[in-house]
């Protein structure tokens, strides 16, 4: 559950990875990527993006696996406000068969779970980038030239019957 300011150039995200090694094929499941600001006069964008990347992975025909991508129209789903105003909850369920994304308890995307996500554990990241690699203009003036992201809580659950092909760390 988090909230962040929507100033031009802000980029709050909650996502998972199967590997941090760029030389290893892996899955990146972006639960929420919200892009702040759509111009100085209208800094609040009503939606956010969900993307599933399958880095370096190919289909049986040799083509690269296509990602899943969805723009989540919060207000059209019955949301009471944009992503940046009050706290919202974002969720991800990765099952043996399906991967499901949620916004405030509402299912917003479902796709088949990729093989790597079935075989390797996922770890999650929460970050608040300013600017980003695409060179977005940054304008934090509305917020006193500062910007914050507030994380109220994170909950992680695991199913007991999931068996990974690599060992998980021992519990201490």
How would you name each of these model-derived features?
Residues 1-172:
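GH16 jelly-roll
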